[in-house]
């Protein structure tokens, strides 16, 4: 699997995930800087108030 891993509005970058990892995630929340977006491999557990989208195809988490 290949997932995007660039933060927020940075230029797009992606990375290959470890063998057996088939998910990518896009996690969003707001703080004093505005909306923060984190992307990567896997499908993490998040705290309430954080928007999480997980998907199962290459570069699906933009």
Swiss-Prot record:
Q: Which domain of life is it from?
A: Eukaryota
- Subcellular localization, per the record? Secreted
Which segments carry the region annotation Disordered?
A: 1-21
Gene Ontology molecular functions: acetylcholine receptor inhibitor activity; ion channel regulator activity; toxin activity
Which stretches does UniProt call biased (Polar residues)? 1-16
Q: Which tissues show it?
A: Expressed by the venom gland.
InterPro entries registered for this protein in UniProt? Snake_3FTx, Snake_toxin-like_sf, Snake_toxin_con_site, Toxin_cobra-type
Protein name, entry field: Short neurotoxin A
Query: One Gene Ontology cellular component annotation?
Result: extracellular region
Tell me the protein family, please: Belongs to the three-finger toxin family. Short-chain subfamily. Type I alpha-neurotoxin sub-subfamily.
Q: Cystine bridges: which residues? A: 3-24, 17-41, 43-54, 55-60
Q: Which SUPFAM superfamilies match?
A: Snake toxin-like (SSF57302)
Keywords of the record, alphabetical order, are: Acetylcholine receptor inhibiting toxin, Disulfide bond, Ion channel impairing toxin, Neurotoxin, Postsynaptic neurotoxin, Secreted, Toxin
Role: Binds to muscle nicotinic acetylcholine receptor (nAChR) and inhibit acetylcholine from binding to the receptor, thereby impairing neuromuscular transmission.
């Amino acid at each position: 699997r290949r997932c995007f891993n660039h933060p927020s509005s940075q230029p797009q970058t992606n990375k290959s995930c470890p063998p057996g990892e088939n998910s990518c995630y896009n996690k969003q929340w707001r703080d004093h800087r505005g909306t923060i977006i984190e992307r990567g491999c896997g499908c993490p557990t998040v705290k309430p108030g954080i928007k999480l989208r997980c998907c199962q195809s290459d570069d699906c988490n933009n």
